[in-house]
Amino acid sequence: MPASWRAGMTVALALAVCAAAPCRAHGATSSQRPATGPLGGVNVIGLYSGVSPAVADRQIAAARKLHAKVVRAELRWSTLEPVRPNDVDAAALAFTDRLVGAAAAAGIRVIFTVDSTPCWASSAPASLLRNCVPRKSTPANAWPPTDPASYAAAVAYLAHRYGAKLAGIEIWNEPDQSNQVYFAGPNKAQRYAAILKAAYTSIKQADPSVRVLAGSLVGSNGLFLRALYARGIKGYYDGLSVHFYSLTLASVRAIHEVQLANGDSRPLWLDEFGWSSCFPAQRIQEEQACVTARIQAQNLADAIRSLSGTPWVAAAVVYHLQDTAHENFGLIAASGRRKPAFAALSQALLRPYARPHRVTLALLRRGAKIVAAGSGPVGDYMELEAFVGGVLRYRALFILNRFNRYTIPLPRVLGTRAIQVRVYQYWAGLAGAALARI
């Protein structure tokens, strides 16, 4: 879920050097293209106390119109087994049965993200446990279980009950968050690794076909993932899930490079990403992902199509199906009106290999200066290279602003004539470069 907004794309930033080798594309080439695109889908409302099974029907009907292959839903363990172990709440089960059943009938599979520790299992301090009430959200729910086996039993139950109707079971939500909202307490990597190992073993015993998704990471610097590798998690998951909201493609690439450096070939599941259509009425917590409704639609389509040629990305799941009172990440407004993003994502999931928006470039004279200006596809760093007399004289690394545009003044030392400029996105590489001369 969006929090601690990741490195925004609200300003264009340029870092210049004199010369360096050009970067190659970091997506897949056409020869590497998988037979089918990643499992495209959308996040939907999951299991929490009081949710109506009818909500499941409406969400799956919308997901089907999106051509979604998967939906991702949070499943709160504290709602599933609120009072004691192995005592599954009947109302909770009615919702999950309805969601999984409706999805299966529509040809859609479900990713369950299982988090939120029940009071009886929580490792929270006594001061928090005293105020922990079953079926109510409290700070104690964010603390991991005292015994990982209790969590493992719950996810094994889900694997046994739903089996092949699940796309996967994601082990917790965002344990590397710097806040204490989802995974509280000390020694996070150590405790998460213990939960993951117990969960993987139990799920595979219940149904070996059910995928186990580890990580649920928000950080792309690799620190938490390296800490997990040091605690022996390799071999205890089928996919590594990540949640990247800013510089989505660059973040996916960065975490994949950490995987490769550690001999990890499991695919990435980008099962939470998106943009909020809150501009210009910005909300503080959404500032760095805040765009217009039109840009939200464009970004989602471009991201899906950029990722579709990447064999090591198994899924791309947009956050979220519908706006809430606090967030505008949805494809559908809180009123029920479809936003432009709904149609854009539907077309992208139907035609995932269509080309993303191209890089554009114009060289403009502004007094005694030359300015490079244009636009590009969202998600990664951009590179500008300026040549004089066929020699590379200037390079700028930058990111697009919230409207996917850029303006880069060229250094005056380059002069104002016989300049050739090339701009490209790292992910797409030189094949997608825009060229201009002046």
Region spans (language model):
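Low-complexity, Ser/Thr/Pro-rich intrinsically disordered linker/stalk segments at domain junctions
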Residues: 341-438
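Active-site cleft segment of glycoside hydrolase catalytic domains centered on the general acid/base Glu
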Residues: 51-55, 81-95, 122-239, 244-264, ...
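Aromatic-rich peripheral "rim/lid" segments of glycoside hydrolase catalytic domains that contact
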Residues: 128-131, 175, 280, 295, ...
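Bacterial N-terminal signal peptides that target proteins for export
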Residues: 1-11
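Hydrophobic faces of well-ordered beta-strands that scaffold small-molecule active sites
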Residues: 38-44, 69-73, 110-114, 167-171, ...
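C-terminal region of N-terminal signal peptides and the immediate post-cleavage residues
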Residues: 18-40
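Bacterial N-terminal signal peptides
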Residues: 9-20
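Catalytic domains of carbohydrate-active enzymes, especially glycoside hydrolases
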Residues: 55-78, 106-113
